[in-house]
Structures are given as C-alpha cells and as structure tokens.
C-alpha cells in the first residue's frame, strides 16, 4: 500500500511518484488549495491538493484529523518562502494526484495538538491515539533501537538468549508477588517472576556460561514515577567471570549504546564505595552532575551547649553534617521554611541554617538561629571545612545517620535543581562494597537479595558477624538513577544456608522454598555473577522522558490499573469455581 514512509521523503525523491499511507495530522484550506500534513511512525510530510483535479480536491476538502488515508502524488520542492526548517521533510511537499480514504475518524476524545491538556487517565484510556503523536512514536522506535543494539552486543560477545519460565514459584525478593491460581492443583498458586534470578543461576549450573534475556518482570508494589507493576529487564548472567569482568563487559555495552544512539561518549565510570557515597552525597545512587557534598562536623559541635547538635554528635548511631549551597544566602525566610518542610518528608525534625552574608565582617556577617550556641572558633571551622564564601548558606542535619543522609541527600538534589548547579549532561559511575545486610525491626534483611555472595569470608565468619559483612555487589548509576545492579552469586550450599539462617529463614522453610536451589548447589556449581538493567529506566533517561510510562507502549496507572482495558476486572464465577476460589464480599454495616 505504500512506497515510502512519510518522514523519509527528501530532496533525493524530487520528481518521483510516491504512494504514502498514514493519518491526517492537520488539514487546512488556504485560498482554494487544500494542505494536509500526513503522518506515520517516521514523521510528517505536507501534501497539496489543488482544484485542477476536481473529484480528488473535493474529497480532500472533507478530510479531518486522524482520517486514515492513502495518497499518491509527485514529490516537488517547496517554494523558498514556504520551507519549514522545523520539519524533517520541510524542504519538499507532495502534489497529490490520488486520494483514498481508508477509514474516517469519529470526533476525537482527546486533543492531538495540545496533548498537555489531556489528563494522564485520558492518555492511557486512548493510548492508541496518544501513541500516534510523533514524540511518543519516536520514543518507541528509540526503544526498539536500544534493544536491537543490546542484542547485537551480547550476541557478538557469546551470550545466549535463553527464555526462563513466567509461571514459577514465589520467592522473597523484596516485593509482593503476583499470584496465579492453579486449576489442576486447587488451592495452590504460581507466582509471576520478580526477576529470572534463580533460573539464570540454574542455567549457569547447566553449563550455559553466558546468558541474557530481555524479559518481563512483575512486582506488586507501591508505584512511583519510575515504577510499574510489570517492567522489562536486560538480564545478564555469566560463569567463570569475576565481578570486575562483568562490570567491564556491561560498561562496554552501555558505552556502545550511548555512542551508537546518542553519539555520546560516556567517559570514565568512576567507582565509589557505598559508605563513601552515603557520606558525601547521602545516597547510594548519587548524581555526580551536582557538585554539592555533605560534610561531617560532629567533631566540631560535640561539646556545644545545644542538644540538637551535641546529642547526635555523641551518639554512635548519630550524625551531624553540613551542606553548603553557593549563593544560597539569597533564600528568603519563606523559602527556608519550605526547605525545612521538604526535609521533614525524609524524617528531619527541623533544619538549622547559617547564612554567610559577609565573610570579612566576622561574626557580624553571619546570620543563624543557632549562632548563639556556637563560638566564633567553631563557626570559622565550619566555614573552613565546608568551603563557604560570602553569599552562601549552610544547612545542617543532626539526627540518626540514616535520617541525616536521606534529608540532606534530598536537599542536595533539590538545591542543585533550584540553583541550576548541575554540571555536564551524563555522569555514570559504579557503586560497590554494599553492606551484605541491613537491620530492620531488629532482624537482618538482604540489601540486594539472598543469593548475593559476601566478599572474602567463610560461612563461619559470616555467621559470627553478619553486620560487618560486605557483599560482592555493584550498581551502575547514571545521573542519580540506578540503571542496573548485580553481584557475584553464592555458589556454595553451606554459604547459602548460612545466609538463609541469618535472614531468619529456618532450615525447614529454606528447604520448602529453595530446596531445588540447595540441591543444585551440591553438584559442581561454577562461580557465577551477573547483572540486570532496567530497560524502561534506561530509555527514560536517554529520551529525556519524565516517567517510564512515557517510554512503554501500554503502561499502567500509578494505581496499577489499565484504563484502556479496564483491567483488573472481576473474574467469571464459573472460572473461579473451577479454580477453587471463593471471593469474600465486603459486608456493609449499618451505622
């Protein structure tokens, strides 16, 4: 039905007859000549119909937005005065000779020209219309190019694309599972995989030493701008490769991806330990474009007569830190109050501050509600350590170390945006040496997942001091977003059982949930390591989209619903009976 895509027509086609199909983006009658912009996935081209061809002209006059049409015509150059530099095809136009209306369009339920006027609900309900917009089409085309580039790289490096099951067994990976009832085994359930983690490890044990898969994963968790109940991973696993080798190989893949598709050289991937990242940036995925850093000052204020400072400064679990914002002395009291409220979202009970109005004026040039508690010597030490200059403001965090990191880390990002401090476009990095476990409500939880190997210790040493263990894990971070995370895996049954025990998974439960893994670990398991990238997040960053919903064809809402299909929905009672499931109706009580 077509000879070319609309967006591909250019001056090399001058004088040629072409056949195009697509949708009417816009139609207008100017002085007895009908102009229409025809759109397909590759872009737009202008088509002109003049009255010389009466029947065709009259038909063209009836066209409205989103009519699906086929046109035949001759490519010609636009007059100099009508060249549109904003269009890829802006130097040419099609003189229409024939026109076929394939399908008319009903009045549109949403605006195609001013899509900002459409609600998120409307855009998702009529997604097939929203995806016709060039911006959305470009993102999905870009997504296809990314997956193609990834496949070429991995195929070329000896990786095998192997599928793993979608119907599997529930395993604890940090979020709730989506469950699928079994009709054959009534009362029993499959789970949709949160990741292919265990199956890809089993593939390593099977001898497939380089595996990859671009795979759907499912997590029933609270949603944010960068989360969806179903998402796509670039999943990678290797045998007989160290963490260093896995990082080198995947870094090479990411460099090639950005070079091929954006013509961007990502430069160096510096490495930073988890401890250093939390200390300097208050985050385990720091945005290195932001030059601001947290500075510890507990040693300077541990003896001041101010409990807000001296309490955390003398608490082994506490922290007192400062954040200098260049030119921040310009902040009004209301703006500081807004920053205080913002810090409160992350657990901070308040926000002490110090304005450096005039460094040369000594204490007279300093403004702060806590100045009366600080000696001139301490103030000078704080200014020296933070590098503050005249016109700057220093914000203070004093609390438990995790609260200070979260609150000042978030303020660091906010101030970086507010004061336009970001430097450079792309700043990749690796974060390494994560703790193996974290304490939550008195018990240990895996920082990554229960199959991550500790670095350089035996099962006995791990059991003796779990809190001190460092995992052999690594996260790739770009501009403050975690692109992917991975680790060396446990390949020893004793070590795996020890980790389960530390996590409170007793032997009987471990056998019930992971017996197949523990059994497999007994039969010559090779050392193996891997990594998984969030494909949706990578596309979001590379295209500049504000949400992963804008780089997925048919995403869910933030409440995990699909307005297009009205999913989820109620099941047929007959089907529920076959599955052995009874729905408990919520009974309304009379007041």
Swiss-Prot record:
Gene3D superfamilies cross-referenced by the UniProt entry: Bira Bifunctional Protein, Domain 2, GAD-like domain, Nucleic acid-binding proteins
Pfam families associated with the record: GAD (PF02938), tRNA-synt_2 (PF00152), tRNA_anti-codon (PF01336)
Chain segments annotated as transmembrane: none
Protein name (database record): Aspartate--tRNA ligase
Enzyme class: ligase
GO biological process, any: aspartyl-tRNA aminoacylation
Localisation per UniProt entry: Cytoplasm
InterPro entries: Aa-tRNA-synt_II (IPR004364), aa-tRNA-synth_II (IPR006195), aa-tRNA-synth_II/BPL/LPL (IPR045864), Asp-tRNA-ligase_1 (IPR004524), Asp-tRNA-ligase_1_N (IPR047089), Asp/Asn-tRNA-synth_IIb (IPR002312), AspRS_core (IPR047090), GAD-like_sf (IPR004115)
Function: Catalyzes the attachment of L-aspartate to tRNA(Asp) in a two-step reaction: L-aspartate is first activated by ATP to form Asp-AMP and then transferred to the acceptor end of tRNA(Asp).
Membership in a protein family: Belongs to the class-II aminoacyl-tRNA synthetase family. Type 1 subfamily.
Binding sites annotated in the UniProt record for ATP: 219-221, 228, 482, 534-537
Main location: cytoplasm
Organism per entry: Shewanella frigidimarina (strain NCIMB 400)
